[in-house]
C-alpha cells in the first residue's frame, strides 16, 4: 500500500503543518474506500521497482533518470515491461534508464511556454492542482522549488508518480496526494499555485478560483491554464453536450471574461501570458497511450473545429497575484 508518512514527516515543521490536523484522516479514508480494480496490480509494479540510485539525473531541462548505461539489457527490459503495466501514460515525456516513455501529451512544450513568465520558483513551496502523473512537479523541483505538492484523484496517476519517484529518490520533497482541491483544507500558505487543464472540468469555475486563492499566501502567485474561446468579456461557451468527445467540459470563457473572473475573486496583476492552439503534434496517441487522442476529437474535414462543431482547443495561460485574505474578501 502506498504510504504518505514521508509527506507527513516532511511538512511537520513547515507552513503546511496545519494539514496534519485533517489530511491523515482524509487520506486514510481514501485508502479504505478506493476500490479501483487495477490498484493491486499497479502496487505490485511499485513493489518491484528496486533499482540503484541513478548516477545521472536531469530535472531542469527534462525529466531524465539515468544515462542509459547504468542497467544491463535484461534489467532495462524488465523495467520497461513494468512501466508499461502502468499504461496509459498521458503526461510527460519521461526518460528512464534509456527508456523513452512517449506520453500522449508533450507536457514539456507546455512547460516551455509557461516557465519564462513565472516568478522564480527558487525556495518556493508549490501546489500543482490536477497534476496528472506529476511531470510538471518534477520540472518545478528542477527549477529550484523547495517543496512541491501535487493533487489529483486518479489512482493511476498516483502510481505513475510513485514509480518515477522510486526510481529517483523517495525522500525528495515532492509529493502527490490523490485528492481533489475541494478536499483540501484552506491553508493560505503556498507561494505558487498551478492549475493547468482543470478549470473547464469544474461545474463551478468561480468556486475553483476561490479554492485556488485559499491555498495561496498573501502576494502568492497563481498560474492558471485553461481552454478559452474568442470573444469579449461577456463571452462564455457552455457546450450543450460534449466538447471534443468529453462530457465533463462545462465553461470555456474568453480571455477577457476569465480576466474579469480572476479580478472578481480578488486577484490582481492579472496577465494573459500565452495563447496557444493545441496541435496534433502536442497531443497524440503513442505506444505508451494507445487510446483515442486529439485527432479523433476534431472534425476530420476541418481541424479548426471539434467533432461537435465547436472551436478547436485553444489554451490560455494567466498569471495573477492573491490580493486579499478570504476573511477580508468574503
UniProtKB/Swiss-Prot annotation:
E.C. code: 2.5.1.-
A Pfam entry, by short name: Methyltransf_9
Keyword tags: Transferase, tRNA processing
Enzymatic class: transferase
UniProt entry tagged with the keyword Cell inner membrane: no
Catalytic reactions on record: carboxy-S-adenosyl-L-methionine + 5-hydroxyuridine(34) in tRNA = 5-carboxymethoxyuridine(34) in tRNA + S-adenosyl-L-homocysteine + H(+)
Gene3D superfamilies reported for this sequence: Vaccinia Virus protein VP39 (3.40.50.150)
Binding residues for carboxy-S-adenosyl-L-methionine: 91, 105, 110, 130, 152-154, 181-182, 196, 200, 315
Taxonomic superkingdom: Bacteria
GO BP: tRNA wobble uridine modification
Positions of transmembrane segments: none
GO molecular function: methyltransferase activity; transferase activity, transferring alkyl or aryl (other than methyl) groups
Record-linked PANTHER family: METHYLTRANSFERASE, TRNA U34 CARBOXYMETHYLTRANSFERASE
Function: Catalyzes carboxymethyl transfer from carboxy-S-adenosyl-L-methionine (Cx-SAM) to 5-hydroxyuridine (ho5U) to form 5-carboxymethoxyuridine (cmo5U) at position 34 in tRNAs.
Similarity annotation: Belongs to the class I-like SAM-binding methyltransferase superfamily. CmoB family.
Subunit structure: Homotetramer.
Protein name in UniProt: tRNA U34 carboxymethyltransferase
Amino acid at each position: 500500500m502506498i504510504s504518505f508518512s514521508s509527506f507527513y514527516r516532511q511538512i511537520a515543521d513547515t507552513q503546511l503543518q496545519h494539514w496534519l490536523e485533517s489530511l491523515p484522516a482524509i487520506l486514510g479514508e481514501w485508502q479504505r474506500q478506493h476500490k479501483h480494480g487495477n490498484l493491486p496490480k499497479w502496487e505490485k509494479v511499485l513493489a518491484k521497482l528496486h533499482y540503484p540510485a541513478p548516477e545521472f539525473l536531469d530535472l531542469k531541462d527534462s525529466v531524465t533518470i539515468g544515462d542509459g548505461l547504468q542497467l544491463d539489457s535484461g534489467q532495462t527490459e524488465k523495467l520497461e515491461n513494468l512501466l508499461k503495466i502502468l499504461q496509459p501514460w498521458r503526461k510527460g515525456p519521461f526518460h528512464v534508464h534509456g527508456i523513452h516513455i512517449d506520453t500522449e501529451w508533450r507536457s514539456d512544450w507546455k512547460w516551455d511556454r509557461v516557465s519564462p513568465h513565472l516568478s522564480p520558483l527558487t525556495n518556493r513551496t508549490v501546489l500543482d492542482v490536477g497534476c496528472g502523473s506529476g511531470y510538471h512537479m518534477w520540472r518545478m523541483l528542477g527549477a529550484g522549488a523547495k517543496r512541491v505538492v501535487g493533487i489529483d484523484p486518479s489512482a493511476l496517476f498516483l502510481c505513475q508518480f510513485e514509480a518515477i519517484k522510486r526510481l529517483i529518490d523517495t525522500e525528495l520533497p515532492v509529493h502527490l496526494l490523490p485528492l481533489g482541491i475541494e478536499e483540501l483544507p484552506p491553508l493560505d500558505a503556498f507561494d505558487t499555485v498551478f492549475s493547468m487543464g482543470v478549470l473547464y472540468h469544474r461545474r463551478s469555475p468561480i468556486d475553483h478560483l476561490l479554492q485556488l486563492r485559499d491555498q495561496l499566501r498573501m502576494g502568492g502567485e497563481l498560474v492558471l491554464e485553461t481552454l478559452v474561446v474568442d470573444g469579449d468579456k461577456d463571452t462564455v461557451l457552455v457546450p450543450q453536450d460534449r466538447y471534443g468527445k468529453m462530457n465533463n467540459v462545462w465553461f470555456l470563457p474568453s480571455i477577457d471574461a476569465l480576466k474579469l473572473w480572476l479580478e472578481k475573486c480578488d486577484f490582481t496583476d492579472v496577465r494573459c501570458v500565452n495563447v496557444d492552439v493545441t496541435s496534433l503534434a502536442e497531443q497524440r496517441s503513442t505506444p505508451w497511450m494507445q487510446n483515442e487522442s486529439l485527432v479523433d476529437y476534431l472534425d476530420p474535414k476541418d481541424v479548426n473545429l471539434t467533432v461537435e462543431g465547436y472551436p478547436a482547443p485553444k489554451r490560455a495561460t494567466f498569471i495573477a497575484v492573491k490580493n486579499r485574505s478570504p476573511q477580508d474578501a468574503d
